[in-house]
Regions:
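Condensing-enzyme catalytic core mediating Claisen C-C bond formation in acyl metabolism
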Residues: 2-100, 187, 196, 200-274, ...
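Claisen-condensing/thiolase-fold acyl-transfer catalytic domains that form or cleave C-C bonds
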Residues: 2, 10, 110, 134-135, ...
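Short coil/turn connectors at secondary-structure junctions
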Residues: 13-16, 123-127, 154-157, 183-188, ...
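Conserved beta-ketoacyl condensing-enzyme motif
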Residues: 56, 60-152, 291-307
Length: 374
């Protein structure tokens, strides 16, 4: 995007707003305890391993997750993605995983977009398209596939936010905010689609076990316009991003021949507990606000321990992160789509939010925040 677009956007007092959010999940809903049984076959060599995994799954705060893969609650003879062998060999390759991504991600994206537009907004009126994903990529990519399936204008402005991880939705909102401020008639469509369950790995490591108990598949779409559009919505006030360098090795996402490899250390909740409060103070200071002004919290449900760390960091009373806990319980961690699932729940159940703070975390360790009101 041209630097002048951002300069012009942030030299104005106008706001952008979210006018609609849609979500979609794949067909296969797996109970957390069914996934546990599958993963015990993968990781548990001994009864002690099984007991440890059972404890972790029971403590996860997750009841179910969705996947494009049916195998996680099927008997071995009914597996479709993994080899029907106790050794799981030959283990699915990166090529097979990307084939599955290319098959399912565009269709799931379209389901979320249709839920977002909900017959009230015509696809031909969309001027800008931003696709977000860290679980698959190709060229031509998700942006062109969505454009074709939704019959969007061939001249549409499009861009992609790739491989940024769980905070990428906030980054996309920031890009859309700049567009809407610079172009008053813009209608910006964001779609975040993550097929995390394609990338579960074979090696018995704590990172792989943690990823296998946390992540699910899902898609979320957002329609944004300039503030003077007549449609009601959530007005976006400000954005703030900060990196915690000491956590750069504690959360990572890398390519390998067998898929994408997750690094997710147990130190992350401690880092967030130590640093999150200060980051939010600096974010709120941009608009001369403080914690007392905040009425609502939209926090990425990265995991139960992360939400507990935020509770401690901000000295919350019980219930202030209830929407985040609900999304974690119903869907697991959906990477970039998660925070939009939380925001949708809030928008559809709360009539007024005088000061909302949203935050998501990802590799870096990066914290992306935004403030909003309606």
């Amino acid at each position: 995007m041209h630097i002048g677009l951002f300069y012009n956007a942030y030299c104005t007092e106008s706001l952008s707003k979210i006018v609609s959010i849609g979500t979609a999940v794949p067909a296969y809903c797996h109970q957390q305890m069914d996934i546990l049984q599958f993963m015990q076959q993968v990781y548990a060599a001994t009864e002690a391993d099984k007991r440890k995994m059972r404890f972790l799954y029971h403590q996860s705060g997750i009841e179910q997750r969705y996947s494009v893969i049916p195998d996680y609650s099927k008997e071995i003879q009914d597996w479709k993605f993994y080899p029907q062998s106790e050794s799981l060999e030959p283990f699915p390759t990166l090529e097979l995983r990307m084939t599955m991504y290319s098959k399912h991600a565009p269709l799931l994206s379209v389901d979320a977009i249709r839920d977002c537009l909900n017959h009230a907004h015509h696809p031909k009126n969309i001027t800008h398209l931003i696709t977000v994903s860290c679980t698959g990529m190709s060229a031509p990519g998700l942006d062109l596939q969505v454009m074709e399936l939704m019959d969007l204008k061939k001249s549409i402005f499009r861009t992609s936010v790739n491989f940024m991880g769980c905070y990428a939705a906030v980054h996309a909102l920031k890009i859309a905010d700049a567009i809407c401020k610079a172009e008053k008639k813009a209608q910006v469509l964001i779609v975040c689609t993550e097929l995390c369950t394609l990338h579960f790995q074979r090696e018995n490591t704590i990172d792989n076990i943690t990823a296998s108990l946390l992540f699910g598949d899902g898609s979320a779409a957002v329609l944004m316009t300039a503030d003077d559009n007549e449609l009601p919505g959530l007005h976006l006030d400000n954005f703030y991003s900060e990196v915690i360098p000491k956590g750069k090795r504690d959360m990572a996402w890398e390519l390998s021949s067998s898929g994408f490899i997750m690094t997710l250390s147990g130190y992350i909740p401690e880092l967030i507990e130590q640093d999150f409060s200060g980051i939010l103070q600096r974010a709120l200071a941009k608009e001369n606000s403080d914690f007392d002004d905040v009425t609502d919290w939209c926090i990425h449900p990265g995991g139960k321990r992360i939400l507990e760390a935020i509770h401690k960091s901000l000295q919350f009373a019980n219930g202030q992160l209830s929407y985040s806990y609900e999304v974690l319980k119903e869907f697991g961690n959906l990477s970039s789509a998660s925070i939009l699932f939380v925001l949708k729940k809030m928008l559809y159940t709360k009539k007024e939010m005088r000061k909302l703070v949203g935050a998501a975390f990802g590799p870096g360790l990066t914290v992306e925040t935004f403030t909003a009101h309606c």
